[in-house]
Curated annotation (Swiss-Prot):
Organism: Burkholderia mallei (strain ATCC 23344)
Name of the protein: Fructose-1,6-bisphosphatase class 1
Cofactor remark from the record: Binds 2 magnesium ions per subunit.
Taxonomic classification: Bacteria, Pseudomonadati, Pseudomonadota, Betaproteobacteria, Burkholderiales
Entry binding sites for Mg(2+) 1: 94, 116, 118
Keywords, ordered alphabetically: Carbohydrate metabolism, Cytoplasm, Hydrolase, Magnesium, Metal-binding
Amino acid sequence: MSITRRTTLSKYLIEQQRETHNLPADLRLLIEVVARACKAISYNVSKGALGDALGTAGSENVQGEVQKKLDILSNEILLDANEWGGNLAAMASEEMETFFPIPANYPRGEYLLVFDPLDGSSNIDVNVSIGTIFSVLRCPDGQQATEQSFLQPGTEQVAAGYAVYGPQTVFVLTTGNGVNCFTLDREVGSWVLTQSNLRIPEDTREYAINASNARHWYEPVKRYIDELNAGAEGPRGENFNMRWIASMVADVHRILNRGGIFMYPADKRTPDRPGKLRLMYEANPMSFIVEQAGGAATTGLKRILDVQPTGLHQRVPVILGSKNEVERVARYHEQAQS
């Protein structure tokens, strides 16, 4: 009987280390630890009501958002998995107001890990796909991290990825050499390579936006969406479909597989706080992944990966996905400025 040879995440990373010589061993180990933590989160998510982890925790995070029990548990899983391995100088999370330095009793490394432990957690109780998003940076101060150490533009990321906890659990990764997708084989507990070198089509007929906010949009976004909604009779001459899951990982994963544009723009409700999504652990890693897959990502006025962070929890407008559509929206913003 022949054995089916499959490429696991560990094998893939080791091969990348040998072939490209730009994947250091400690970065490889860090990615494997994050992936292992995502397996633990997936297990807890899948238990649902049986695991007594649904519902709110009776607390709020630094953004003033009500924390779900699984938000807190997922954050603890990632901290516990990564604090002792010697690969990190510090971590930062959506669920923590300030950064988490590696305790003095553990060895420290040269990387910084930033993550949203459970993106889309408002969907937990209704069994919609949710996920984990992460970004890896080098610590510019060696092994002594400060909050300033984290405030690097997205172009400085050395790795980024996300896990989706849905019908299958998948782990999507880039180290700056394309985008690959691994599916969790629950029988043996391994991440198995199932999609290589993912590419986002440059054109699309699908868009993702929360249309209930239409009355608050600025003119460039309103103009773009009005054109799409006009369909074949409008200026675009074709029909478009809207898809909105309200879970960034799920929406972006769909776009990564079949194209589309995802939009969470700034609007008139909070002119002093542009956008809702966080730059460091949502917009930057997703933009890195999307660009590596041939797509584009912008705030409307600037490439997201070029934005200089001013704080760990800074928010930005996010428009990403199929390149030609993203560039069209950016063009409308430029025209509105002139």
